């Protein structure tokens, strides 16, 4: 199917474009971008007046829960949620059941995605066998089978010598290491951010040092091995400072944060709200401010959701025993657009963090509207108003702290390889 997107505000940081243009998609590829183009007779015409046309958004950190945990989410529902949120590609973390630590499981995910997924699915393999932090997984075979990175996400690689070797091997194979940076000894029995709110609620806290100490270690190991590293889901002002300083020294470090870390504080936990329980935990106002500054000054490269679906039975329990994690694919875009409204970022920089940089970090041939590129396109209605309602979410799980909240901004169309996979009602 050929598609002609007419008169939208095209924002493509990969080409430094921000102007009203037409876009022609032919045979699943970007054919032409320009002013006053003529629509071919056989093309579906999309009138994009008043809408934003961007490279397809890429979420480099999601949990699709397949294989083994499909009662929370699966490839179909997870990629439906991605498409509804404007994402044309997702990278899925390996903490499935079994863990994606070998080529058989990677191949299963790749083949299932080819058969069922609405968007591109790029698997992330485990750093260590079973993500147990004892022996390295076969990174070469993981890459060969289709993994775009390795991570033990959900838990840190506690052994620093093992992490050093992981970085060295991954560098040799051209595989990105995504670090879940957390010092478990400092986390202890903590269930939320250590601070005033935790004290008031009588809950055990997780100090900011649990993140900062681990981020510092991982950054120094990357510097020592002269290897690239990507730090997942940073949430503290200290992490921002450590990574900013490391970049200034020339360390090959990139990082991401999630919308909840610039949209909420630990106040959201009041009332023992388990849908506001995640790891790392929601922090304090000064951390939120630091995350926004880090996004604005380029310290933070990407916005990723850490979409972590859980069944109601795993969330509708006492706060101490509720599982960590929230869904985020369908709320990420409006929450991130708020950064533009608040003048933290301009629109081009936001698209860079949600499409261009994730593609670059993971080595994908996406995140651009250049001629010949795969036609992954997100068309955004920045003024669409809607309310987050559980029954209207595509995700199988409904564990969002934003339920009931009014949102502004939504994906009007999501186009993957030249095919419309989502159209807003």
Swiss-Prot record:
SUPFAM superfamilies: Composite domain of metallo-dependent hydrolases, Metallo-dependent hydrolases. One of its GO terms (molecular function) is dihydroorotase activity. Keywords: Hydrolase, Metal-binding, Pyrimidine biosynthesis, Zinc. Its cofactor is Zn(2+). GO terms for biological process: 'de novo' UMP biosynthetic process; purine nucleobase catabolic process. One of its GO terms (cellular component) is cytoplasm. Pfam families: Amidohydro_1. Binds 2 Zn(2+) ions per subunit. Pathway: Pyrimidine metabolism; UMP biosynthesis via de novo pathway; (S)-dihydroorotate from bicarbonate: step 3/3. The active site is at residue 306. InterPro entries: Amidohydro-rel, DHOase, DHOase/Allantoinase_Hydrolase, Dihydroorotase_CS, Metal-dep_hydrolase_composite, Metal_Hydrolase. PROSITE patterns: DIHYDROOROTASE_1, DIHYDROOROTASE_2. It comes from the Bacteria. Zn(2+) 2 binds at residues 153, 180, 233. It catalyses: (S)-dihydroorotate + H2O = N-carbamoyl-L-aspartate + H(+). Substrate binds at residues 63-65, 95, 279, 310. Zn(2+) 1 binds at residues 61, 63, 153, 306. It is an enzyme of class 3 (hydrolase). Its EC number is 3.5.2.3. Belongs to the metallo-dependent hydrolases superfamily. DHOase family. Class I DHOase subfamily. Catalyzes the reversible cyclization of carbamoyl aspartate to dihydroorotate. NCBIfam families: pyrC_multi. This is Dihydroorotase. It comes from Geotalea daltonii (strain DSM 22248 / JCM 15807 / FRC-32) (Geobacter daltonii).
């Amino acid at each position: 199917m050929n598609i002609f997107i007419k008169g939208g505000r095209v924002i493509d940081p990969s080409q430094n474009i921000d102007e009203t243009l037409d876009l022609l998609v032919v045979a699943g590829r970007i054919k032409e971008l320009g002013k006053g183009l003529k629509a071919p007779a056989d093309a579906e015409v999309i009138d994009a007046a008043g809408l934003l046309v961007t490279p397809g958004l890429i979420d480099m950190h999601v949990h699709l829960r397949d294989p083994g945990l499909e009662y929370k989410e699966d490839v179909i529902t997870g990629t439906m949620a991605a498409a509804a949120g404007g994402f044309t590609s997702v990278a899925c973390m390996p903490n499935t059941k079994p863990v994606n630590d070998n080529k058989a499981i990677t191949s299963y995910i790749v083949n299932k995605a080819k058969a069922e997924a609405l968007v591109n699915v790029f698997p992330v393999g485990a750093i260590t066998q079973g993500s147990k932090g004892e022996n390295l997984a076969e990174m070469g075979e993981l890459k060969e089978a289709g993994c775009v990175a390795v991570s033990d996400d959900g838990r840190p690689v506690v052994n620093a010598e093992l992490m050093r070797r992981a970085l060295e091997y991954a560098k040799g194979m051209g595989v990105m290491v995504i670090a879940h940076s957390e010092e478990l000894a400092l986390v202890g029995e903590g269930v939320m951010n250590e601070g005033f709110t935790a004290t008031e609620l009588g809950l055990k806290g997780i100090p900011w040092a649990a993140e900062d100490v681990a981020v510092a270690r991982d950054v120094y190991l990357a510097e020592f091995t002269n290897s690239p590293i990507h730090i997942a889901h940073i949430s503290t002002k200290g992490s921002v400072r450590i990574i900013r300083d490391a970049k200034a020294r020339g360390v090959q470090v990139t990082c991401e944060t999630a919308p909840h870390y610039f949209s909420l504080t630990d106040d959201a936990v009041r009332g023992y709200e388990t849908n506001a329980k995640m790891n790392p935990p929601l922090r304090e106002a000064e951390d939120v401010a630091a995350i926004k500054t880090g996004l604005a000054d380029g310290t933070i490269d990407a916005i990723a959701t850490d979409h972590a679906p859980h069944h109601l039975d795993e969330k509708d329990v006492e706060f101490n025993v509720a599982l960590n994690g929230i869904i985020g694919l369908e709320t990420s875009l409006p929450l991130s657009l708020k950064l533009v409204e608040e003048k933290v970022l301009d629109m081009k920089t936001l698209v860079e963090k949600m499409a261009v940089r994730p593609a670059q970090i993971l080595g994908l041939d996406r995140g651009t509207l250049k001629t010949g590129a795969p036609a992954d396109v997100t068309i955004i209605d920045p003024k669409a108003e809607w309310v987050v309602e559980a029954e209207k979410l595509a995700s199988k799980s409904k564990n969002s702290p934003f339920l009931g909240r009014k949102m502004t901004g939504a994906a009007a169309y999501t186009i993957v390889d030249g095919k419309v996979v989502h159209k807003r009602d």
